[in-house]
Amino acid sequence: MKILVVGDVVGNPGRKTLYAYLEKMGDKYDFIIVNGENSAGGFGITTKIADEFFSKKIDVITSGNHIWDKKEIYTYLEASDRLLRPLNYPKGTTPGKGYTVVESRKGVKVGVISAQ
């Protein structure tokens, strides 16, 4: 199984570069993980961008401290098990979760942990 892990995608230029790469090479991978905490202009991630990532066959979005920069994402974090906050942030005081298990395109379950 081939897994692509992409570090910090920053702003629109980072998203455009990622999408261009995935357009050419995306089918080569069975599972794609992207750090999206700075994908909204270098500060946080929006629900629109998260949905955009998932539409590009990105399986899980990880994050760090900048996940909190856009308050609109808080509800999305609670509802999604594919957008992760850092695991080592206090449970109960921060929305979402820091780990997930998602089935790959090959039918293999993949565990992902987001820690900062």
Question: What are these language model-derived features?
Answer:
Residues 1-116:
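Acidic, metal/ion-coordinating pockets
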